Each structure stands twice: as C-alpha cells, then as structure tokens.
C-alpha cells in the first residue's frame, strides 16, 4: 500500500515519496510533507529555473540558489519565476 502524506503544496492527502529526495534535514522534511505529484511539479519548475537562468550545477552558488528555491516553493512564499516568463496559454 502506498504511503500517504498530507501534502503541504497540494493541501490534501496524496501519495508520498518512496524515499527522501535529498540528504539531511531538508530531505527528511520534504519526504514527510510533499507528495509525489508535488515533487514532480517541483522538478519541472527546477528544470525551468536551470534552463532559463543558465545555471551551472557545478557552481556551488547555483546549487545553493536551487536549494533556497526548493525551500521557498514548498515551505515559503513560492519560488522565483525566470525573468520575462510568460505562462503558456491553455
């Protein structure tokens, strides 16, 4: 049976992650509070941030920026959007 969590992003109970996605306390917090669906949405957002901001993940500042954005996305006021981003029309 799937592990269920009260997802902090979706605001409802949903299937939880299979394992902590990051090491340390942040990984544990994400594992306990974020659903698979919300994690997939974060991965899409993270990819957009990496591509649009041309982040080099070999640079520790880029990794720190993404970690801060992850914390904002799930536990804060929301992550940044790339400059000039226009959401696609549905």
Swiss-Prot record:
Q: Which GO terms describe its cellular component?
A: cytosol
Does the record bear Iron in its keywords? yes
The superkingdom of the source organism is: Bacteria
User: Mind listing the UniProt keywords for this protein, alphabetically?
Assistant: Iron
Q: Which GO terms describe its biological process?
A: cellular response to oxidative stress
By its UniProt entry, which Pfam families does this protein fall under?
Answer: Iron_traffic
Q: Which GO terms describe its molecular function?
A: iron ion binding
- On whether NADP is a keyword of this UniProt record, the answer is no
Q: What does this protein do?
A: Could be a mediator in iron transactions between iron acquisition and iron-requiring processes, such as synthesis and/or repair of Fe-S clusters in biosynthetic enzymes.
The entry assigns this protein to a family as follows: Belongs to the Fe(2+)-trafficking protein family.
NCBIfam families recorded for this chain?
Answer: PRK05408.1
Please give the name of this protein. Answer: Probable Fe(2+)-trafficking protein
Q: Which organism is it from?
A: Laribacter hongkongensis (strain HLHK9)
The taxonomy runs:
Bacteria, Pseudomonadati, Pseudomonadota, Betaproteobacteria, Neisseriales
């Amino acid at each position: 049976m799937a592990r269920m969590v009260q997802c902090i992003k979706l605001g409802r109970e949903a299937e939880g992650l299979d394992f902590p996605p990051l090491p340390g306390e942040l990984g544990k917090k994400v594992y306990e509070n974020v659903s698979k669906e919300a994690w997939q949405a974060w991965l899409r957002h993270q990819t957009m941030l990496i591509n649009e901001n041309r982040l080099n993940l070999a640079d520790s500042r880029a990794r720190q920026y993404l970690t801060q954005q992850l914390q904002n996305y799930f536990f804060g006021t929301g992550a940044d959007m790339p400059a000039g981003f226009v959401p696609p029309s549905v």
